[in-house]
Amino acid sequence: MKKNILTFLLLGMAVLLISGCGESGKDNSWQKVKDKNQFVLGLDDSFPPMGFRDENGKIVGFDVDLAKEVCTRLQVKLKLQPINWDAKEQELNSGKIDCIWNGFTITEERQNKLLFTKPYMKNRQVLIVTAGSTYRTQTDLKGKKLGLQAGSSAADALNSVPDFKDSLGDVVEFDDNMTALMDLEKGGIDTVLMDEIVARYYIKNKHKKYQVLEQELASEEYGIGFRKKDQKLMEKVQETLEAISKDGKMKKISTKWFGEDITVIGAK
């Protein structure tokens, strides 16, 4: 009798353990966003034209407009949360934000840590120099001082060309690209390595006298980063992005910021 009771208790405990494991492993990431009626987007608010503050201090940009459209269709409120870009993965994994969405380059290293949507835009890492500069190639920058944003994909691009990196006199990290460009303008550094999309927008809209060297260091793609376990939330955002692309709304948003559709969702 005692043996039967013991067996029954052990079976009951096993069932509880199995059901408990099942619940803890359940992906309710999308449901959590629905329940709190808020999608928290982590971004660098000094990264035009993807996400930045306008003259009134309001956060605007291509990614911001796209995220607003996604949230409108998902019927949840959007919260824009500026973060330290150099600590973006920590901000995400701590639960402070639901995603990283701000000209976020998909790299192999990041894919090992995060879950990404499919790419929605292509970009290049390029070198920026002052207008009238005699620098035309990477070779011309031998022994010179290069600036880049800390924690950005520019650092990955630089590491991918070790010969060029080793030829430089110094590499200086900045909190953001705009600070690096200001230091370039003052003569503190000789070149800035950054996203071409950001550089060309800045040159055009801020009327700054910089030039982009034709020789790129790397080509890349932008995606939206989520926690590895948040598959359901990522899929919901991906589905919505595809719908926005299909009905032409994404083209309108892209044309507003870039003068044409440079997105790649649905492109063959």
Region spans (language model):
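Flexible hinge/capping segments at coil-to-helix
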Residues: W30-K32, V129-L146
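Short helices/loops that flank or line small-molecule/ion binding pockets
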Residues: T72-R73, Q81-P82, D86-I100, K113-L115, ...
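Extended ligand-binding regions for polar small-molecule ligands
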Residues: G22, V64-R73, T139, K144-K145, ...
